[in-house]
Structure formats: C-alpha cells, structure tokens
Amino acid sequence: DPKFAFKLGFWHEKISPIPDFEQSYLWYSVSVSSGVYKAMKLRDRVGKEIEVEKIDELQNEAKEIITKNKYFNQQNTEENI
C-alpha cells in the first residue's frame, strides 16, 4: 500500500527513537513510485543525509519492492477472478 510505505518512511525519519535515513529514503521512494508524489520532497530531503552510492542501492531496492508488490497484487487479482 503506497500510503503505508509513506508512513514507514515518515516513521524511520521522524518517529523512530533512532532515525534511519536510509530506510526512510527507501520507503519514500516506494511511495513516490506508487503515486504518492508528496513523498518526493521528503525523500529528497532525507537523501541529502545519505551518500550518493548508497542512494543508487536504495533506488534499486525500491524497484525490487515495487516489482514484487505488483507481482503479488497481480497473483491475488487472478486468484479472485
């Protein structure tokens, strides 16, 4: 769920006792790719705290999450038909 991904990003950035900007960036990226564009500004803000090389890894990880999520959503839809 894109809104849940947004909430995870926010939690890792602002609520967690130990902020984790990498996890925040990851979940904001998933959220943006799923259509929650207000997460873009937040993702870019936490991205300033992360090394460029790590951002590339996180973007690839976000793509994997999105791809797997689309696969499972498609499987669930086909099973319900």
Describe every region a protein language model picked out.
Residues K14-P19, S33, K48, V52-I55:
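Short coil/turn and helix-start
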Residues P2-A5, Y37-M40:
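Helix-start (N-cap) detector for alpha-helical repeat units in TPR-like alpha-solenoids
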Residues A39-I81:
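Terminal, low-structured helical/coil segments at or just beyond the last alpha-helical repeat
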Residues A5-K14, D44-K48:
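Hydrophobic face of amphipathic alpha-helices that form TPR/SEL1-like repeat modules
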